[in-house]
C-alpha cells in the first residue's frame, strides 16, 4: 500500500469512527429510548438539520456515483432530464406535502408512514399499514443493497480490498450508529455527511478541470462527441455515434420527480420537524442544496470523460465501471502530494457519506415498519417499550444482512437498482399520500387499491411491457403512478364514503 493510500485509509477510518461516536452520543442521551424518539426524534428537529437530513438521505450513492457515471458514458440527455425532474419534485414535495403531513401526523399521533395511512383512513384492522409495511420491505431492501454495493465498489476499485469484505465492514458501521442512536443519530450524521458530500463535489470538479486541461478543453471534448451535449439525442459510447432521446423519453425521465411524494425516509423528516412554520426555511435550504449538488455531479461525469481523453484515467466502458469515475479522479488526486491525498480521503468519505446517509434512513424506516406496523398493529403482538426497541434494532440488523446478500454481485449498477426502488415507492405511496392530504372523499378501499396497483404496475411494466421496446420502453414510475391515481379515484367513488370522524379530522386539518 502506497503512502497516499495509507493517508486515504486513515482519513476514512477517522470518518467512520466519528459516525459511530455520534451514535454512541445520542444513545447515551436517550434518543433511542422510546419508539417516538427512535423513529422521529421526538419531533424536535430544527430546520437546518431537517433540510439537510432529508436531502442527504435522498441523495444516495447515485449522487456521487450514479449521476456522474451516467453523464460520463452517455452524455447529458437522460441524466439532465432526470435531475430536472428531481429538482422540481424536491421543491413541490416541500411546498405542498411537508406542512400538511407534519400537521396531520401530529394530530393523529402517527410515527411511521404506514401508521399515518391507517389512522388517516380510519383503518382499524390495520390492513393498510400491513400492506404499506410489506411495500417498504420489498423496495427498501434492494435500495439499501445498492448502498452497500457502492461501499464495496469504493474500497475494491481504490485499494484492491476484496469487494465483499469491504461491503460487510461498511454495512456494520451503518448498522452500529443506527441501532445505537436512532433517528437523532441518523439525522445528525446525515447533516455531517451532507457537508462531506458538498466538499467532495466542489474539490473534485476543480481538480478534474485542471487535469483535463482547463474548462475550454472539457467543453471542446464534450462537443466533439456526437450527441453528447444534445438534450434530445445522447451519445452511444459503444458505437461512438449519436443516439435518439425522444419526447416520450423526456417526459418519462422527468417523472423521477413524482417519486418524492412516496419516499418514506424523506417524508419522515417532514413529520419530525420541531415547528410547522420552520418548514419554509427548510424548503429553501433543501432545494438550493439539491439543485447545486446535482448540477455539479453531472458536470463531474462530463469532466471525467475529458480526463479519460487526456489519458489520465482509463476508459470506463460499462455502467458499473463508469460509476467509479469519481473514485478514479480521487485516486489520481492522491498521487499529487500529502495535502491532496488528505483531500482525496475526504472526497472518498463523501462517497461513503452519500451511501450511509441513505442506508441508515432506509434501515430505520424499514425497522419501524416491521416492529410498529407489522408486529404490533397488524399481528397484534403486545410489546412493552424495551421489547419494541429490541425488535426495531433486530430488524435493522436483519434487513442489513439481506441487503448485503442482494448486493453480493459487484457488477450491478447503482443507478439502475435505485431507479427501480424509486419507482416502487413513488407509485405505491405517492398517489396515496397526495390523495390522503388533499381529497376528503378518498377512503381506505381506494387507498389500498392505489397502493397495490402502483406497486404491481411497476413490476409489470418493467419486466413485461418495457422489454417490448418502442413507446413502451419508458420509465415504469410514470404509468404506475397514473394507474394508482385512477385506481384510488374509481374505487373510492365506488365504495362507501369515509366515516364522519375521518372527514371531520380532514376538515380540521385543512381549515388551518
Predicted regions and their residues:
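Membrane-embedded helix-loop-helix hairpins and adjacent transmembrane boundary segments
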Residues: 1-512
